[in-house]
């Protein structure tokens, strides 16, 4: 196949896969578009003709999907040069070695190459979603939101199971497309299919088992151990606008009172979003005792007589943290959790103690400070209206997109994940829904309830099967009083054994490389 044709197919596949991910037209994406895009990726790489071409084509695919689906990163104020520009360029080069490996996997026997292709794809998505530079967007699981029975098995494998089975299905369909393209007639096509029947039958059987498992899980009724009556506030204001500081707090207070009044019932907990109090609450309690002037924050707490989760900076000596506070109705700090997984180069700049790094960032974006990463996986606890203690954790912003962060928070003893987020800067529906889709897998992986309180969307409550219990429209000032089901703390297979699947796939590939080298060495003698 000529390079131009391969490039054109990769371009089409990038567009299709981007439509598979939640976007401005299809709020929750399209599995059909996503799978179609992956089939074309397989077909293009299979026929591109060389490792170098495959590396370039896959680098283009990854970077272009990133650019199309995460274009809203350009709205991250002063950081667009990093969040969109540098990241797009970086993904092109980082993905190239995986393109090389994918092409290498396609040189194996027809019956084996779909499995090796899927294994390498899984390792790419694992690498992309892990570590300081991690960004778990633009991945295969994101096209599967509407396939509820199909995604339930992530409580065994984590989302890595989807990162394997989705490209495996696409690879099998790609093999069928390859057979069709090189068949003179239907008889030759069906004869060709018999030559690749092993991966086709195995994959079909695996998909059947996965769906039977999912249907079974969805049919089992889960009874909550108790409920946490929660007011979720979506103030739809910009916390970065210092001129609106008081108005933002007053809006959040008014929305909280509105939800309580509508329910005519005292809540167990109020949840405000990330950065709702931009002046650090700790050491500034007196400040919040007089502001806002006509409705001070601490008086509001006393009026509602309810604990609150609220996002506010936390300063400890010279270190600053993006934090979530649990405050009592009296305004006392009951506990603080500091965000661990920070946005690279936006919230956290590595080696910032180095004068050269300071000068570089001062020159480039006009400042060189940021948050420090937290170090402790905290679990908060309060008593609900039934007198039962409910333990929960508060991943901040895009921490709910990271399996490892939420898994460690859950394993610390959490019964509910309560995420607080500020995504208003994105200004797009697709950003809000993408974040939600990535995050909702945590509920299924850990079989726990997920609550998301955001300042503009998507504020939602998700049950342990990924079903939406309650939500609010995007970019509207709104609040809701909801009974959050609490199912008690338990560990799923994935919570117990963590990232066992990518580790196993990595070891299999290393063993295969060892065998290849051994065979090559034997063949020379």
Swiss-Prot record:
Keywords: Acyltransferase, Cell inner membrane, Cell membrane, Membrane, Transferase, Transmembrane, Transmembrane helix. SUPFAM superfamilies: Carbon-nitrogen hydrolase. It is a multi-pass membrane protein. One of its GO terms (cellular component) is plasma membrane. Residues 228-486 form the CN hydrolase domain. GO terms for molecular function: N-acyltransferase activity. It is an enzyme of class 2 (transferase). Pathway: Protein modification; lipoprotein biosynthesis (N-acyl transfer). Its main location: membrane. Belongs to the CN hydrolase family. Apolipoprotein N-acyltransferase subfamily. This is Apolipoprotein N-acyltransferase 2.
């Amino acid at each position: 196949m000529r390079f131009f044709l391969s490039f054109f197919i990769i371009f089409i596949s990038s567009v299709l896969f981007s439509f598979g991910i939640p976007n401005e037209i299809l709020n929750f994406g399209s599995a059909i578009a996503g799978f179609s895009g992956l089939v074309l990726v397989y077909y293009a790489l299979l026929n591109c003709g060389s490792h170098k071409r495959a590396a370039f084509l896959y680098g283009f695919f990854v970077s272009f999907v990133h650019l199309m689906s995460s274009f809203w990163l350009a709205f991250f104020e002063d950081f667009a040069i990093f969040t969109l520009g540098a990241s797009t360029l970086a993904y092109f080069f980082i993905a190239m070695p995986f393109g090389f490996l994918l092409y290498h996997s396609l040189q194996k026997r027809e019956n084996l190459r779909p499995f090796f292709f899927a294994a390498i794809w899984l390792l790419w998505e694992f690498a992309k979603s892990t570590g300081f530079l991690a960004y778990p967007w633009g991945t295969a699981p994101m096209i599967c939101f509407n396939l509820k029975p199909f995604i339930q098995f992530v409580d065994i494998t984590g989302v890595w199971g989807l990162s394997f089975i989705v490209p495996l299905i696409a690879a099998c369909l790609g093999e069928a497309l390859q057979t069709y393209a090189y068949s003179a007639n239907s008889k030759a096509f069906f004869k060709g299919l018999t030559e690749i029947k092993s991966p086709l039958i195995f994959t079909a059987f695996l998909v059947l088992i996965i769906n039977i498992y999912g249907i079974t899980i969805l049919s089992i009724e889960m009874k909550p151990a108790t409920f946490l009556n929660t007011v979720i506030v979506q103030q739809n204001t910009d916390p970065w606008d210092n001129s609106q500081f008081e108005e933002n707090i007053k809006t959040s207070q008014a929305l909280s009172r509105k939800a309580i009044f509508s329910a005519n019932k005292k809540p167990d907990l109020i949840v405000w979003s990330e950065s709702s109090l931009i002046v650090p609450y700790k050491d500034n309690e007196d400040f919040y005792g007089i502001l806002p002037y006509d409705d001070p924050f601490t008086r509001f707490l006393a009026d509602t007589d309810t604990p609150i989760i609220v996002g506010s900076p936390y300063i400890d000596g010279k270190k600053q943290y993006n934090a979530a506070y649990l405050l009592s109705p009296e305004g006392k700090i009951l506990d603080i959790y500091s965000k661990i997984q920070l946005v690279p180069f936006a919230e956290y700049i590595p080696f910032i103690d180095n004068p050269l790094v300071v000068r570089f960032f001062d020159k480039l974006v006009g400042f060189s400070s940021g948050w420090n990463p937290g170090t402790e996986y905290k679990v908060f606890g309060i008593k609900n209206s039934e007198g039962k203690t409910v333990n929960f954790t508060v991943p901040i912003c895009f921490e709910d997109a990271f399996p490892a962060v939420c898994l460690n928070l859950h394993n610390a003893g959490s019964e509910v994940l309560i995420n607080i987020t500020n995504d208003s800067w994105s200004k797009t529906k697709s950003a809000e829904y993408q974040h939600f889709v990535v995050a909702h897998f945590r509920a299924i992986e850990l079989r726990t309830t997920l609550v998301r309180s955001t300042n503009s969307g998507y504020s939602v409550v998700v049950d342990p099967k990924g079903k939406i219990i309650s939500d609010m429209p995007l970019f509207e000032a709104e609040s809701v009083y909801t009974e959050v089901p609490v199912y008690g703390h338990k560990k799923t297979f994935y919570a117990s054994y963590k990232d066992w699947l990518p580790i196993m796939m990595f070891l299999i590939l290393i063993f295969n490389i060892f065998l290849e080298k051994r065979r090559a060495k034997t063949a020379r003698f």
